[in-house]
Amino acid sequence: MDNLTKVREYLKSYSRLDQAVGEIDEIEAQRAEKSNYELFQEDGVEEHTRPSYFQAADDSDTESEPEIEDNQGLYVPDPEAEQVEGFIQGPLDDYADDDVDVVFTSDWKQPELESDEHGKTLRLTLPEGLSGEQKSQWLSTIKAVVQSAKHWNLAECTFEASGEGVIIKKRQITPDVYKVTPVMNTHPSQSEAVSDVWSLSKTSMTFQPKKASLQPLTVSLDELFSSRGEFISVGGNGRMSHKEAILLGLRYKKLYNQARVKYSL
């Protein structure tokens, strides 16, 4: 207490007391504006490196915004979506499916057979929507069917639809031009001795009936074909025997099935 009393008495007689108080107030005002960290530095406290989590927080604050902008175009999977084993989810398609118009053929017509003073005409309507290559294939198919009529009677053929197309069959096909093997007899007949069977076009061949009540069937190539060209066009050839040519004519005229029932062909 004595010391404190002495200090008070001394301050009363201190001539620069007001100046000292003002300096103290100014120092206190400056200290109030500074952070505790800065005060520690002024007081000589040793500066330590800032903890790593402060640095990480600062880095994340400065880099988070550009990183979000850079990843805006990337696909972010939904964390709440149900995960399926083996399934890797990727970005969804960013385009919409194009609308495709489907048009069903409505103007197609059944084949029509027309007759006039010039003859007969069969009209086949081309299917709609075919490409150039498909149209060519369709026309080639029709042409092949027409050409095949030279080697068999289409009216006697069977028509079968399959998964790959159409199958046309006939049990007994007329002899092929390049595969005919003449039957050689011990005593060759006149028809086998000639070089061209059409030279016997006016010669008749007789087939005996299976029943006594019927008359024998006598027929010639001239009666079955109008010309040698017609005979060749349906599969005939000069190397055929006379009987083979006659049987070909009966098939061509659609008389073969009826004749083989009544006569020994």
From Swiss-Prot:
It is found in: Virion; Host cytoplasm. The modification Phosphotyrosine is found at residue 14. The modification Phosphoserine is found at residues 60, 64, 226-227, 233. Residues 49-105 are annotated as: Interaction with the L polymerase. Residues 58-70 have a biased composition (Acidic residues). CDD domains: VSV_P-protein-C_like (cd21033). The record marks 138, 141 as: Involved in oligomerization. Residues 42-74 are annotated as: Disordered. Residues 171-193 are annotated as: Hinge. GO terms for molecular function: RNA-directed RNA polymerase activity. The modification Phosphothreonine is found at residue 62. Residues 1-60 are annotated as: Interaction with N(0). Residues 245-265 are annotated as: Interaction with the Nucleoprotein-RNA and template-binding. One of its GO terms (cellular component) is virion component. Pfam families: Phosphoprotein (PF00922). The N-terminus is disordered and is involved in binding N(0). The region of interaction with the L polymerase is necessary for transcription. The hinge region is highly variable. The central domain is involved in oligomerization. The C-terminus is basic and essential for binding the N-RNA template. Homodimer. Interacts with the L polymerase; the association of P and L forms the polymerase complex and positions P optimally for encapsidation of newly synthesized genomes with the nucleoprotein. Interacts (via N-terminus) with N(0). Interacts (via C-terminus) with N in ribonucleocapsid (via C-terminus); this interaction allows to package the L polymerase in the virion and positions the polymerase on the template, since P acts as a bridge between N and L. This is Phosphoprotein. It comes from Vesicular stomatitis Indiana virus (strain Glasgow). The lineage of its organism: Viruses, Riboviria, Orthornavirae, Negarnaviricota, Haploviricotina.
